[in-house]
């Protein structure tokens, strides 16, 4: 009998292993890199998860990863709106987080309405995109270029990469699963590790 895991994702498991609550999941491919703020699968709980501190935390995490792991010296980050029209969350929470990040030196813009942002290909002007909840970014991500995509865990001391696929437990032990996404994740992990080591070497012993 198959024993189902007690963790909702490998990211949650790794967070316990590394002893951290400050983590996030990034989806990345050649077209776009994106993550999201509200770590809940329930739409009814999304709005209360959107706080200024939560948005700022994701901006910092994505900025750090883009610099350390993806070789972006001055990352440009876009932040999406929660609603289809500008409401209280955009005015009182997301905009404040964006402005505070700007005042701290981050190159960040938003909030953008997600429909027009993706329809007009605005994402091509940015190194990373932060959505407010998972489905807001995963749908466009898959539509743009799902092949050769990875899921990358931000905020961990080690490089943690997996294929950007849903786990198909019904395919276990049937020898029918496509292996190329796993190979892509392994190659991506190697590239990310190399870039992080280069970043560490370039930034150590800097003059104050």
Label every model-predicted segment.
Residues 1-208:
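Anion-binding alpha/beta catalytic cores of soluble intermediary-metabolism enzymes, centered on
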């Amino acid at each position: 009998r198959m024993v189902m895991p007690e963790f909702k994702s490998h990211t949650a498991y790794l967070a316990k292993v590394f002893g951290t609550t400050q983590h996030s999941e990034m989806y990345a491919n050649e077209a776009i890199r994106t993550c999201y703020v509200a770590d809940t699968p329930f739409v009814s709980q999304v709005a209360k998860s959107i706080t200024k501190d939560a948005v700022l935390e994701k901006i910092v995490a994505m900025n750090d990863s883009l610099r350390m792991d993806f070789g972006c010296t001055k990352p440009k980050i876009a932040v999406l709106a929660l609603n289809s029209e500008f409401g209280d969350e955009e005015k009182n929470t997301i905009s404040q987080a964006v402005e505070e990040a700007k005042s701290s030196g981050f190159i960040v813009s938003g909030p953008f309405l997600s429909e027009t942002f993706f329809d007009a290909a605005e994402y091509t002007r940015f190194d990373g995109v932060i959505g407010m909840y998972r489905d807001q970014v995963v749908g466009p991500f898959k539509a743009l270029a799902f092949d050769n995509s990875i899921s990358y865990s931000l905020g961990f001391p080690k490089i943690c990469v997996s294929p950007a696929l849903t786990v198909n437990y019904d395919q276990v032990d049937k020898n029918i699963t496509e292996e190329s996404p796993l190979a892509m994740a392994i190659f991506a992990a190697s590239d990310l590790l190399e870039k992080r080591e280069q970043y560490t070497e370039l930034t150590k012993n800097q003059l104050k």
